Amino acid sequence: MNWQQACELPYYNGTDLGANYTPAATTFKLWAPTAAAVTVELFATGTDAEPNAHHLGAHHLQWERDGVWSLTLSGDWKNTYYLYHLQFHDGRTADAVDPYARTAGANGRRAMVLDLDAAAPEGWAEDKRPVIPPHARSVWEVHVADFSADEHSGVPAEYRGKFMGFVPGDTTLDGDGVHPTCLNYLKDLGVSHVQLQPIFDYETVDESRPDGGYNWGYDPKNYNVPEGSFATDPFHGEVRVRECRAMVAALHRAGLGVVMDVVYNHTYHSDSNLERTVPGYWNRRWPNDQMTNGSGCGCDLASERPMVRKYIVDSILYWAQTYHIDGFRFDLMALEDADTMNAIRAALDALPGGQDILLYGEPWQGGSTNFEGGARPADKRALDVLSDRIGFFCDDTRDSIKGNVFDAGNAGYVNGAPQHGHEVLHSIGAWRGGQHGYWPRQAGQVVQYISAHDNLTLWDKLAAVGRRRDYDAPDAELLAQNRLAAGIYLTCQGLPFMQAGEEWGRTKHGDHNSYQGPLETNKLDWTRAHRPEFAALTAFYRGMLAIRRTCARIAGAYGEPQPFVLALQGWLIGFIPESPDPKDVVVVYYNPERTHQWVSLPIGSWRKLTDGVHAGTTPFGPIYRDAMELPPVSVTVLRLE
């Protein structure tokens, strides 16, 4: 199906696709304009392998309008499982899970009629999004299973690695009552948002078995259904919904926003449920009719086609409204077209409080794709047409600080290549000078980071450059490099982002792509987090985050000028974030050298907020005037007295 043929299909602008439940009746609606007939098959269970599995009958849907087939069944069909059977004019048939399914049985093979009110945890009606000002925002990325799977996490065994692992608020290491873990730890770290790697239903983990495997989840199956392997009961579809909401509510009670990692750039299979409902419509193709694979791991969704765009917007709104999600991170955002991303931003903005919902993504692709109809990819080159409240991950900041992620031994500013100071200077002001050919209009568009789930952890990267092989040793040189790296991006303008455990030297022992596990490699090591040397690193992160929150001009969130850069010798960097309040002036210095370095100070009396090892909002140490000595491999922040 080419672009013209796709655009000739009827567009449905309703908001009622899917199974719409009331105790008196359920209405099924499916957009399938090329089908000749559609039947809904009803089942007692999500799979035929479960006790009491049996077929409850089949019912024909009727053609309604604009490509939609519809059926209203009287009676209470709550928790009934269903599947669509489609017949096409050329004789082909297909079985498909409802693309608008709200929940499903084990492994997502059948959708389930859901009573959303009955699938609400206690107190859900009172759940509110935390209000977090732009300058105080920071993101901590974690996989649901990684968060609490550690046997030492203090989380009850039945909740470990599950949505419910986020709910207990008082967990400690082995229950010792002293060393906080999981949510109890997060409450005091100082980050504002938790970004969850994919929590929608994905393909490659067998939900029916406790040992069904591990995956990061970038293999989407049912976009509006929570992943069943994170539920304590994957066989009853209402459980995953209730427990996912309970997780969000627990994070909100702790004052934390929830960002959802979404994968609307591709489907895992070429015969996805979407493709089965309207063959040839949903995915991009080359002129030879082969599906494009710009993600490198699936079949690209054609976001520029009208009903694909609608589907993505509808899905985002569903998660925002039904699960109170506070932000969305788009995997391979450059595989979406810019108009679709702007439509998402506009739709979120129209929600109550929606302008505070974060929206950002990866401004790159994993291969070649084939945009149609003049669509532009949502990459850095499209910043002139993208909303300035759609952010993007800045790989230039990342690589300048620690070295190129695709070359394990390549060094950056903090670990042996201080000449990258030129790029670090641009990072400070969020690259708004167009130095690399892209022009952010606001600092808040730039996600400043040095590690994420992809590639080596920060600790492992520093170890690789330094040719260390003992990833568990609290190497003093690596700790200093880690602190400087964090000190840089946490004093850059933009939105700071970190991988969970970066703040305690998280290691995967050199595994740069642990997407299939094992869990032992990926899970957070809460014992390591409380080893004294790594706990001190965490304390440094906590202090730097506090400095950032209290010195709003460092963040430069929206409408802020770029910092005033000081002229210093060699590869030293110093700058002053502009402040209208003379009582709220700080100066920041980076020293990548392995020796002490003297610097001249701006006029005034200054005291330290950080000396490169300790950090916090209370000034400490002597008063400095005229000049001071910077410690080796360090970040120094001074406040004007």
Identify the role of each PLM range:
Residues 1-23, 27, 55, 63-168:
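The feature marks proteins involved in alpha-glucan
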Residues 11-15, 494-511, 521-523, 527-586:
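Glycan-recognition and catalytic regions of carbohydrate-active enzymes
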Residues 20-36, 563-602:
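Carbohydrate-binding surface patches
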Residues 30, 84, 142, 196, ...:
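Conserved, mostly hydrophobic/aromatic
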Residues 32, 79-82, 621-641:
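C-terminal beta-strand-rich structural cap/linker in extracellular carbohydrate-active enzymes
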Residues 43, 474, 478, 524, ...:
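C-terminal accessory region downstream of the catalytic core in glycan-modifying enzymes
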Residues 114, 345-346, 350-351, 355-505, ...:
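Conserved alpha/beta catalytic core and glycan-binding cleft of carbohydrate-active enzymes
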Residues 145-323, 332-352, 358, 369:
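Substrate-binding/active-site clefts of carbohydrate-active enzymes
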